Amino acid sequence: QEPNVPQPQPQPQPEVTQKVVIGYLALDDWEFENLFPTIEWKYLTHINASFARVKADGTLNINPVRKRIESVRETAHKHNVKILISLAKNSPGEFTTAINDPKARKELIQQIIAFTKEYKLDGFDIDYEEYDNWDKNFPSLLVFARGLYLAKEKNMLMTCAVNSRWLNYGTEWEQYFDYINLMSYDRGAFTDKPVQHASYDDFVKDLKYWNEQYRAAKSKIVGGLPFYGYSWEESLQGAVDDVRGIRYSGILKHLGNEAADKDNIGKTYYNGRPTIANKCKFIKENDYAGVMIWQLFQDAHDDNYDLKLINVVGREMME
């Protein structure tokens, strides 16, 4: 008879923390109806529905999102993707006015929490980009963040989009957020000199800066990927927006499919597939939280399915 030898117990596997892939989704995008059915949900963990607009009195202008937020939430949840409402200024100066006035600030906090609950969302995202008089206004922004953090329900996610390196957020900011989305793009884009607005080197520096200077945990830091570029080409002036921005889909349309594996053609600068892949690899190899995309509707269309940047992100981050 065999002695009663205890069987070896299976050892628990080390937990693999899933990387986040946060896609901004502009609910008032002019291509929404055509492109929403083509979203690659399997490669996303979160979407930030943009934007509910902050007014000076602390109320929200929800017209840009009201019509579609519920159907988008239902689709996201069906695919096990979390959805947050992203908050930005209504018109220049209004967000700042709201956070600087204690009464409006209190109203704004209540409105954000109420909106998140009413529409059964998973949280909210603060996209404050009023950079003038930063040092004067930042203390109010910090009070606002703390107030939101204390007012929210425990299971509500609280995230933000931040400027990558040239503003001082200090070491207090990060503690209130689950994820901090670094806008590692738009560098030098608003000048007359053609320039790469989102280089790999700057991406790496931004991530390290937030970890080392602002003491944000790597598990909160999310690197931003642009699905668009800028063009200074005379021949493309009819294809760009008022700040020379052009969607990745537009770059392929006007410059040809070979653009997909480059970062610039002539005076048009963007991130092609290899750079997007390398940025994702850096995130994984260095244990940052994940990547954020601005924004999903700028990607290649399904007639160029193999050239879609989201497929590169999905392959690198999920597989």
Per-region residue spans from a language model:
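Bacterial Sec-dependent N-terminal signal peptides
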Residues: 1-16
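Glycan-recognition patch characteristic of GH18 chitinases/ENGases
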Residues: 13-116, 195-201, 208, 236, ...
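Short, well-ordered coil/turn segments that N-cap beta-strands
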Residues: 19, 43-45, 79-83, 120-122, ...
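Substrate-binding surface in catalytic domains of secreted glycosidases
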Residues: 25-26, 56-67, 110, 130-255
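Glycan-binding loop/region signatures in secreted carbohydrate-active enzymes
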Residues: 43, 218-287, 302, 306-319
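Short acidic catalytic loops
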Residues: 46-51, 116-132, 183, 290-296
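Conserved, mostly hydrophobic/aromatic
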Residues: 47, 85, 126, 180, ...
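Active-site and adjacent substrate-binding regions of carbohydrate-active enzymes
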Residues: 125-162, 273-319
